[in-house]
Amino acid sequence: MDGLKLRSATPFDSEFAFQTKKAAFKQYVERIWGWNEEEQRRLHLKRFSSQEFSVIQLSGVDVGIMAIVKEPDCVNINQIFILPKYQGKGIGTACVRQVVDDAATTKLSVKLQALKVNNRAIAFFQKLGFKKIGESGTHVRMERPL
């Protein structure tokens, strides 16, 4: 996709990352646990400081965030959130395809989980070749095999 770029997040991106997650994900969290702003901010800060985040940019504009963790046997997409006004434009598809392509070069599958109530995300990942491999009370685990 022309103009699409990932850049490593810095501590200065933490608030953007939180606000992006909130804009894209709050409605789903509310349906399961309710949205406690203080608790969500605490969880975000913990994850943001312990995972490698990237800021997704389109033509120089920050439009989303993504956190990828490479394990010995797979690559995990821990988070991917696109601001609502940029959803449906192929940005998430391009980002996920890049992760899948990069993982394929090292013969690794790609795994993730989505909230069960987020049917849109589940359908999105299925369209990109992900299969359900398990579930918990709240999440569906998915994998894009080699």
Model-assigned labels for residue ranges:
Residues I82, G88-D101, A123, K127:
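Conserved acetyl-CoA-binding loop-helix of GNAT-fold acetyltransferases
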